[in-house]
């Protein structure tokens, strides 16, 4: 099958793994990440843009040193080359 179709909200809420790859293509990858209270992903920089969606909970996204409050339903676009942590 080409592409990927699924109930991403259901899969995300059921995910208990820190990182779970659902789909990988030539120019994109779909990954679920579950972060426990008090944890973070660690500061990262990527060569490609990233899109993140917060399915539940609240926290902070730090992009190039600027902190943003995030919560259930938040969408975050991290441009390529941006230092970030969630």
What are these regions (language model features)?
Residues 1-27, 62, 77:
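A short, N-terminal "cap"/entry segment at the start of jelly-roll beta-barrel domains
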Residues 15-16, 31-46:
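Conserved short histidine dyad/triad with adjacent acidic residue
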Residues 28, 37, 47, 66, ...:
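A generic "binding-loop/recognition-motif" signal
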Residues 32, 42, 51, 66-68:
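Short, surface-exposed secondary-structure edge patches
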Residues 49-60, 64:
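Glycine- and acidic-residue-biased ligand/ion/polar-headgroup-sensing regions
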Residues 65-80:
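Short acidic-glycine-tyrosine-enriched beta hairpin
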Residues 80-86:
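Ligand-binding loop in jelly-roll beta-barrel domains
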């Amino acid at each position: 099958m080409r592409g990927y179709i699924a109930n991403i909200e259901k899969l995300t809420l059921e995910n208990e793994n820190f990182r779970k790859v659902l789909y990988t293509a030539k120019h994109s990858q779909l990954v679920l990440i579950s972060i426990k209270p008090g944890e973070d992903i660690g500061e990262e920089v990527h060569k490609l843009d990233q899109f993140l969606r917060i399915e539940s909970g609240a926290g902070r996204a730090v992009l190039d040193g600027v902190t943003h409050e995030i919560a259930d339903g938040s969408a975050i676009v991290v441009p390529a080359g941006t230092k970030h942590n969630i």
